[in-house]
Amino acid sequence: MDRAVIERRLAEAERHVTLGEKKIANQRRVLENLLRDGHDTAEAERQLQVFLDSQDLHIEERNRLRADLAGL
C-alpha cells in the first residue's frame, strides 16, 4: 500500500475514533440519566457495549495504520 492510501485511511480511522469517543460519552450520559430516574438500563448498557467494542476495533485499525505508515 502506498503512503497516500495509508494516510487517507489513517485520517478516516482517526475520524472514526473521534466519533466513537463522542458516541460513548453520549451513551454514558444517557445511561446515567436512566439510572438517576430509575428506568431500566439494559438496552442502554447493551448499546454502550456495542460502542465500546466498535471503538476497540477503530483504535486497533488506527494503530495498525500508524505502524504501517511508520514502516515506510
Task: Annotate each PLM feature.
Residues 1-72:
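Anionic, Ser/Thr-rich low-complexity intrinsically disordered regions
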